[in-house]
UniProtKB/Swiss-Prot annotation:
It is a peripheral membrane protein. PANTHER family: TRANSLATION FACTOR GUF1 HOMOLOG, CHLOROPLASTIC, TRANSLATION FACTOR GUF1-RELATED. This is Elongation factor 4. It comes from Streptococcus pyogenes serotype M49 (strain NZ131). GTP binds at residues 23-28, 140-143. Keywords: Cell membrane, GTP-binding, Hydrolase, Membrane, Nucleotide-binding, Protein biosynthesis. Belongs to the TRAFAC class translation factor GTPase superfamily. Classic translation factor GTPase family. LepA subfamily. Its EC number is 3.6.5.n1. NCBIfam families: lepA (TIGR01393), small_GTP (TIGR00231). GO terms for molecular function: GTP binding; GTPase activity; ribosome binding; translation elongation factor activity. Coiled coil: none annotated. One of its GO terms (biological process) is positive regulation of translation. Residues 11-193 form the tr-type G domain.
């Protein structure tokens, strides 16, 4: 094809993704679009739905490799090339969405006709607006008995500020309104800009590891053209590779002769190591490189850290390989080796949020069959020392000596909670118990309220979402983003077993709650840790000061069983002998700490914060 033909073809390309709150019908709509454009035959559709979707539902990972090319013949008789870029995985927190949106010009916003706008809908819309995308509102599930499309239309206009007068009323399940959606994509989503004749530039928005072909990049071509035999170069590290294959997904991988400006597809170039490619990097040609990198999606910094240790220590190398493979698809996962006296060798991992942490843990256990121990998640604190240094600390065991600390700052998030009016009291009570500061409250409609709080991230990290759901009978939806660092009265609490610090049980706590929290943890550990042959004191300490203590009584054999009657001094001698043995045992004995003990430090019953 000459450049004239390629430019004509480019005008027919439409790149879009579907954004929606969970369960508003994103996947069903994607399936209907695949069916309507005859990308997948109805026979395969059934199989694909069952296979990929179950997996995606269950594990929160993407369908195959998530950019699908469709051909659609519009009412004007022209055939258009659509690229549906599925927002990967759960869109529970926005970290994955941003990279899909960076490859699009338009987004279909799906809103449930019965439930209306939810917190994550808003978060994703703002992301799409930041990327200057054309947003097409679709009000889905209009065939539900509780559907109220007009109310939702007003919500979209009032809350988001989008013109919803032309919003498509659809039911993905029943196949209503699908054609209208496709026509709107043709009319309203702009064709990709970019120049076929310019030096080749492509944005990597995902990648996957194939045991035979190495790392396969998923790219959006911004300028120029790429074909097998070209030598490509990564702009972040200058490494070069020979392209062996390019192609598109339909959802199966289909090889092509070339990929040109505006295309979304894959590039295989025998890239062996995971570290050579990063999502968000720019690819160009080695012999005619582009002048500058694309401003891709921004690198996200981890907000939550936790230690991951294999239960069987000989699985350490397997765990490293598994983390490297996961990191390939997930540029935001960070890890570095660490050792713990209690748990042996493992890794300190950084995650973007709790959902991210759960998904990674689940994938490690399922896909790689590694049994893990996770330590308590913690956040990044800014510790200012007396010699005017600022240290970033994400692991409680790295906290400097309390005498060197001038003050500590902790991250706060802006939490947006949407909830029916009757539960506003419960939400405010929970947020205040978690040291939240009230910011504002808006009514979305007669019944639903958007409450905004500033809450320390450390208070959200563990079970805030579960508590929120249970106190609002599951009606609340919640989203948060980083706000700022603030000074706080924080202290590090150590747990001592038999006089020894257990590094994996240390945690950071607000001074106000330290005493109660120490007391509760000590009592919990007393119930969980099995009794030993000797007495074990459990202590909670801040610096040198012990704030709580509880003892696990020793198991003891009845050494007097064989003394029938007899002299009291004989009995005393046996008891003294037992006591000396216990004392010796205590001096050298170490205490086995079961996995539940690490988790119990986390699941603080809420009565600690009343």
């Amino acid at each position: 094809m000459n450049s004239q033909d390629l430019k004509k073809r480019q005008e027919k390309i439409r790149n879009f993704s579907i954004i929606a709150h969970i369960d508003h019908g994103k996947s069903t709509l994607a399936d209907r679009i695949l069916e309507k454009t005859e990308t997948v035959s109805s026979r395969e559709m059934q199989a694909q739905l069952l296979d990929s979707m179950d997996l995606e539902r269950e594990r929160g990972i993407t369908i195959k490799l998530n950019a699908i090319e469709l051909n659609y013949t519009a009412k004007d008789g022209e055939t258009y090339i659509f690229h549906l870029i599925d927002t990967p995985g759960h869109v529970d927190f926005t970290y994955e969405v941003s990279r899909s949106l960076a490859a699009c010009e338009g987004a279909i916003l799906v809103v449930d006709a019965a439930q209306g706008i939810e917190a994550q809908t808003l978060a994703n819309v703002y992301l799409a607006l930041d990327n200057d995308l054309e947003i097409l509102p679709v009000i889905n599930k209009i065939d539900l008995p509780a559907a109220d499309p007009e109310r939702v239309r007003h919500e979209v206009e009032d809350v988001i500020g989008l013109d919803a007068s032309e919003a498509v009323l659809a039911s993905a399940k029943a196949g209503i309104g699908i054609e209208e959606i496709l026509e709107q994509i043709v009319e309203k989503v702009p064709a990709p800009t970019g120049d076929v004749d310019a030096p080749f530039q492509a944005l990597i928005f995902d990648s996957v590891y194939d045991a035979y072909r190495g790392v396969i990049l998923q790219v959006r071509i911004v300028n120029g053209i790429v074909k097998p035999g070209d030598k490509i170069q990564m702009m972040s590290n200058g490494k070069t590779f020979d392209v062996t294959e390019v192609g598109i997904f339909t959802p199966k991988a289909v090889g092509r002769d070339f990929l040109a400006t505006g295309d979304v597809g894959y590039v295989a170039a025998s890239i062996k190591t995971v570290a050579d490619t990063r999502v968000g990097d720019t690819v160009t040609l080695a012999n005619n490189p582009a002048k500058e990198a694309l401003h891709g999606y921004k690198q996200m910094n981890p907000m939550v850290f936790a230690g991951i240790y294999p239960i069987e220590s000989n699985k350490y190398n397997d765990l490293r390989e598994a983390l490297e493979k996961l990191q390939l698809n997930d540029a935001s996962l960070q890890f570095e080796p660490e050792t713990s006296q209690a748990l042996g060798f493992g890794f300190r991992c950084g995650f973007l949020g709790l959902l991210h942490m759960d998904v990674i843990q689940e994938r490690l256990e399922r896909e790689f069959n590694i049994d893990l121990i996770m330590t308590a998640p913690s956040v990044v604190y800014h510790v200012h020392t007396t010699d005017e240094d600022m240290i970033e600390v994400s692991n409680p065991s790295e906290f400097p000596d309390p005498t060197r600390v001038a003050f500590i700052e902790e991250p706060y998030v802006k939490a947006q909670i949407m909830v029916p009016q009757e539960f506003v009291g419960a939400v405010m009570e929970l947020s205040q118990r978690r040291r939240g500061d009230f910011v504002t409250m808006d009514y979305i409609d007669d019944n639903r309220v958007n409450v905004i709080y500033q809450i320390p991230l450390a208070e959200i990290v563990f079970d805030f979402f579960d508590k929120l759901k249970s106190s609002t009978r599951g009606y609340a939806s919640f989203d948060y983003d980083m706000s700022e660092y603030r000074r706080s009265q924080l202290v590090k609490m150590d747990i001592l077993l038999n006089g020894d610090k257990v590094d994996a049980l240390s945690f950071i706590v607000h001074k106000e709650f330290a005493y109660e929290r120490g007391k509760i943890i000590v009592e919990k550990l007393k119930k969980i840790i099995p009794r030993q042959q000797f007495e074990v004191p459990i202590q909670a300490a801040i610096g040198q000061k012990i704030v709580a203590r509880s003892d696990i009584k020793a198991l003891r054999k009845n050494v007097l069983a064989k003394c029938y009657g007899g002299d009291v001094s004989r009995k005393r001698k046996l008891l003294e002998k037992q006591k000396a043995g216990k004392k010796r045992m205590k001096a050298i004995g170490s205490v086995e700490v079961p996995q539940e003990a690490f988790l119990s430090v986390l699941s603080m019953d809420d009565d600690t914060k009343k």
